[in-house]
Amino acid sequence: SSAASDVYKRQVQKQFQKISLGSFREILIAGPKYKELASHICSLEELAEYPFVSLENNTSTRDLHIQYFSSHGFPFRPDLEVTSTDQCLALIQHNLGIGFYPEKLAEEPLKRGEILQIHLKESLPARHICLVQNASRPQSIAAQKLIETLIRI
């Protein structure tokens, strides 16, 4: 029944505690071959004709990009799929496509001129990093220290 399901959900929610550790933004980047895109503010519609590099399916990052494009009326169909953000950067640096990358990690390659930022009309939402722990179970000393360290960072 629906009532039993609601009770179960509330019990599970009480059992887990979510601690916000921080947030970050992703930016759209490209290699030097795509410098014309960095010269103006682009729309998602305009970018549909360019090859996209993305993380593979079944990642929260990929899910966010699918949702972002869908919310603006466009499908997200990357041309190249990789398993890590480092691989994304390498392919983008070698002009194999454009893609999203964490802003903080893009700072140095941007300064060195290895990549360019493409500014978007449709802003990408911030990403949030959270720690979820089972509040009903005792934590080991090592786990407590790890959590304290993560919260301080």
Where are these regions (language model features)?
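Secondary-structure junction motif
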Residues: 36-38, 51-72, 139-143, 147
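Flexible hinge/capping segments at coil-to-helix
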Residues: 13-52, 56-57
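Short, small-residue-biased leader/transition segments that mark boundaries at the very start
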Residues: 1-8
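Hydrophobic hinge/microswitch elements
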Residues: 66-118
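Short secondary-structure boundary segments
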Residues: 9-11, 32-33, 103-105, 122, ...
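Hydrophobic residues within well-ordered alpha-helices
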Residues: 2, 47, 90-96, 131
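A late-sequence structural motif
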Residues: 116-153
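Short beta-strand->loop
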Residues: 17-27, 112-125
